[in-house]
Amino acid sequence: MDRKISGSISDTKGHNMNIDDKNFCVVPFVQLNTRGKGDARVCCSITGIERGIPKELLLDEITSENYSAETPVYNLMNDSIADLWNSDFMKDFRMKMLNGEYIPACEFCHRMEASGLTSKRIGKNKRFKEKTLPLLQKYYERNGHVDIMPQWWEIRLSTKCNLSCIMCTPGLSSMMYKEYSKWEKQGKSIPMMQGALDIAKDGGQEYLSSSKFFKKQIMDNLEHCLFMEFRGGEVFADKPSVKFIDSIGDTGYAKNI
């Protein structure tokens, strides 16, 4: 679907970006975050898109009424990485960064920084901003289209876990899914817990680690990859995840990651 990207101008050529160092984050230009059931995030710290990146909504268009279990979201078990990476949502998100906008969905990092802590935004900017800066004007003129596939992958291939860490959620841990389900049956589930459980239920049962389609795309794009973080669940509790990681290690690109 071709649509005008919110926050951009129809013809950016000849215009300059308006990057605000207090708000700019390199993450949407270099990294993608997957979840164990195939949905994705701009990064792990973002708020407001707990069900995944929507196919038909931009960030500013999301409301509690139109973002639900029925909302079409990208799922990398079936949708291509390329389609998600340069979706309207992602291009719009990048243009917000290039136009110097403050993005409320990024408030977790801003709260950390206000407390004197090093946020993910600061950490990733230190690693990637200098390298990415020369490319940003081109991305701006292309309304947020990035022609380099993700260089940093934050991958969750499954939610299979052997621990019940209380700070975790049912969408990330199979053990916490069981705990939340037990509390639901006992009538002890508070609204915030129930909301997290409902989202986890909507994700289905199949793990991303079972998707040959997704894994082939990762293997085909390793030449661009500099960093890979594998998270869970517990990564080593899921045999297909371990096998996939081993297969990456056997490639000629592993020495660069």
Enumerate the predicted regions with their spans.
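Accessory C-terminal segments flanking Radical SAM cores
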Residues: 3-133, 140
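N-terminal start-of-domain structural block
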Residues: 136-138, 162
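Conserved glycine-rich "GG(E/T)P / GGGxP" loop and the immediately following alpha-helix
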Residues: 143-257
